[in-house]
Curated annotation (Swiss-Prot):
Subunit structure: Heterodimer of a B chain and an A chain linked by two disulfide bonds.
Organism: Drosophila melanogaster
Role played: Possible ligand of InR/insulin-like receptor.
Signal peptide positions (record): 1-29
Phylogenetic lineage: Eukaryota, Metazoa, Ecdysozoa, Arthropoda, Hexapoda
PROSITE patterns linked to this entry: INSULIN (PS00262)
Name of the protein in its database record: Insulin-like peptide 1
Length: 154
């Protein structure tokens, strides 16, 4: 009779263990984000180019993603980087004001001498240096989190 009691206890422990394992599996399934592309992109860094990069961005960024601004083309079809819109100059001016308020002061003499021309040249230089998601993931390798940086907010 003693062996039957031990057998029932072992069977009960196995049943409890299976029940706990099933509950943990169900809890993990609820916690794991199913709407993100994180499961579809294996961990680690990847080199993604062309359609593979586009597909990965579509999966990772369901609300779209940022791209680099294209050069504006004039009515004749020629691109002209020197023609910046007034709104872009104002946007850059507000950026400089923010930096100025953060403790970075700029020379009023240079501002008076060059005006928005300095801002335009800085923006053009910044555009040239940053290659965006293509440079990040095709020229170099990138991870899921690096792709997610380019996602638009909801």
């Amino acid at each position: 009779m003693f062996s039957q009691h031990n057998g029932a206890a072992v069977h009960g422990l196995r049943l409890q263990s299976l029940l706990i394992a099933a509950m943990l599996t169900a809890a993990m399934a609820m916690v794991t984000p199913t709407g993100s592309g994180h499961q579809l992109l294996p961990p680690g860094n990847h080199k993604l180019c062309g359609p593979a990069l586009s597909d990965a961005m579509d999966v990772v960024c369901p609300h779209g993603f940022n791209t680099l601004p294209r050069k504006r083309e004039s009515l004749l079809g020629n691109s002209d980087d020197d023609e910046d819109t007034e709104q872009e100059v104002q946007d850059d001016s507000s950026m400089w004001q923010t930096l100025d308020g953060a403790g970075y002061s700029f020379s009023p003499l240079l501002t008076n001498l060059y005006g928005s021309e300095v801002l335009i040249k800085m923006r053009r230089h910044r555009r040239h240096l940053t290659g965006g998601v293509y440079d990040e993931c095709c020229v170099k390798t990138c991870s899921y989190l690096e792709l997610a940086i380019y996602c638009l907010p909801k």
